[in-house]
Amino acid sequence: MVDDAGAAEVLGDEWRPAWSLDRLLRAPLPPPRIRTRPWWFPVQELRDPLVFYLEAWLADAIFGPDRAIIPEIEWMSQVLLTVDVVNSGDLVEISIFGWPRVQNRVKSVLLSLASWHRKHRARAEKMKQLEEFLKTGGTGPQTPEHPVA
């Protein structure tokens, strides 16, 4: 008999420690890949999606890390969105299903949000560099821009 400290469970042909199985069981489930079409979405608009790509960190910032905001965006804009990670993991593929005019509007909104998040991140990095510079006491070559005569 195995004591609790050395407890293990058999999964198929593998032995896994019980603590990793517990951790796996407590992890949140990924969202289901198959969804039913909402009653308000016309079937004919599923034929021609508008597809574009964004960096994965931008998709996390826009849609949330668990993509929880997607249903709200779909309801408010009357489109269907799919956000899938591309092979490398650095990019996500965003597909927008709906009327062409609405597809373009939603794409424009999402790209505007992406631009805002990029600028916000760049500003945060500059602020961090400035803080580091000020912490070091501002040592370095300092030449006045306008020398006083």
Curated annotation (Swiss-Prot):
Residues 49-110 form the KH domain. GO terms for biological process: actin filament organization; embryonic pattern specification; establishment of spindle localization; establishment or maintenance of apical/basal cell polarity; positive regulation of double-strand break repair; positive regulation of double-strand break repair via homologous recombination; positive regulation of meiotic nuclear division; protein storage. InterPro entries: KH_dom_type_1_sf (IPR036612), KHDC1 (IPR051778), MOEP19_KH-like (IPR031952). Its main location: cytoplasm. One of its GO terms (cellular component) is cell cortex. It is found in: Cytoplasm; Nucleus. Keywords: Cytoplasm, Nucleus. One of its GO terms (molecular function) is RNA binding. It comes from the Eukaryota. CDD domains: FILIA_N_like (cd12795). Transmembrane segments: none annotated. Component of the subcortical maternal complex (SCMC), at least composed of NLRP5, KHDC3, OOEP, and TLE6. Within the complex, interacts with NLRP5, KHDC3 and TLE6. As part of the SCMC interacts with the SCMC-associated protein NLRP4F. The SCMC may facilitate translocation of its components between the nuclear and cytoplasmic compartments. Forms a scaffold complex with KHDC3/FILIA, and interacts with BLM and TRIM25 at DNA replication forks. PANTHER family: OOCYTE-EXPRESSED PROTEIN HOMOLOG, OOCYTE-EXPRESSED PROTEIN HOMOLOG-RELATED. Contains an atypical KH domain with amino acid changes at critical sites, suggesting that it may not bind RNA. Belongs to the KHDC1 family. Component of the subcortical maternal complex (SCMC), a multiprotein complex that plays a key role in early embryonic development. The SCMC complex is a structural constituent of cytoplasmic lattices, which consist in fibrous structures found in the cytoplasm of oocytes and preimplantation embryos. They are required to store maternal proteins critical for embryonic development, such as proteins that control epigenetic reprogramming of the preimplantation embryo, and prevent their degradation or activation. This is Oocyte-expressed protein. It comes from Canis lupus familiaris. The gene is OOEP.
